Amino acid sequence: MCSDLIPRGVDYTKFRDAIIKWYREFGEKDLPWRKAGDPWAVLVAALLLRKTTVKQVVDIYREFLRRYPSPARLADASVEEIKAIIQPLGMEHVRATLLKKLSEELVRRFNGQIPCDRDALKSLPGVGDYAASEVLLTACGKPEPLLDRNMIRVIERVFGIKSKKRRPHTDRELWNFARSLVPRDPELAKEFNFGVLDFARKVCTAKSPKCSLCPLANNVCVFYQKRERV
């Protein structure tokens, strides 16, 4: 169990507070899907962002929602029409087919509404735990973790833990631990999650992490403390 590997006496509050403070100063607060209150807009972003970059997605995301502001509108579109919009992202046939199926399922099963329930969301085509968490956190006001490889890297380094799963994002213990870190307040939960993701991309990078810029290095991060002792 991941929780058995966590050092005793760790103050999660310091971690949360440091990440939120960092996000308020350095985070990407203007990304449109982070400000979206519409579950459909958040779900679209989650699917468009797969295997591509934020920079590539922003303009396409805005145009996509302008044309298809609801699942019902997208369900009426053809795969070819959808492909024409998202072609610059690559894998356009796969993405378009998936988005079409998703919209049809939402119309058929949920009357065109996006459910604020994890199991219901995960029953939809192309929606896994991460996409479900994005909708629940950003649009439904639920304090869920956005546990992707970036958050996993930060958590494993800071707390000195390591998932035993070959695919850590499927590790239930890791999900439960990540969930315990998220503030209960919905707005703070967003700042914390977005902060961890931006922090992972800008500071706690996969290669050559910028520990000199890390507010967690000296008094929280196990990875840094071990490296300094070498």
UniProtKB/Swiss-Prot annotation:
Pfam families linked: EndIII_4Fe-2S (PF10576), HhH-GPD (PF00730)
Keyword Zinc listed: no
A biological process (GO) of this protein is: base-excision repair
Source organism's superkingdom?
Answer: Archaea
Give the cofactor binding note.
Answer: Binds 1 [4Fe-4S] cluster. The cluster has a structural role.
What cofactor does this protein call for?
Answer: [4Fe-4S] cluster
Q: Specify the species.
A: Pyrobaculum aerophilum (strain ATCC 51768 / DSM 7523 / JCM 9630 / CIP 104966 / NBRC 100827 / IM2)
Give the record's family classification: Belongs to the Nth/MutY family.
Q: Which GO terms describe its molecular function?
A: 4 iron, 4 sulfur cluster binding; G/T mismatch-specific thymine-DNA glycosylase activity; metal ion binding
Please explain the role this protein plays, according to its UniProt record.
DNA glycosylase that excises thymine from T/G mismatches and uracil from U/G mismatches. Can also process T/GO and U/GO, but not A/G, T/C and U/C. Has weak AP lyase activity.
Database matches in InterPro entries: DNA_glycosylase, Endonuclease3_FeS-loop_motif, HhH-GPD_domain, HhH_base_excis_C, MIG/MutY
SUPFAM superfamilies, A to Z: DNA-glycosylase (SSF48150)
E.C. code: 3.2.2.-, 3.2.2.29
Question: Which CDD domains does this UniProt record tie to the protein?
Answer: ENDO3c
Record keywords, A-Z: DNA damage, DNA repair, Glycosidase, Hydrolase, Iron, Iron-sulfur, Metal-binding
What residues does [4Fe-4S] cluster bind to?
204, 211, 214, 221
The entry's protein name is: Thymine/uracil-DNA glycosylase
Instruction: Name the enzyme group at the top EC level.
Output: hydrolase
> Could you tell me what reaction this enzyme catalyses?
Hydrolyzes mismatched double-stranded DNA and polynucleotides, releasing free thymine
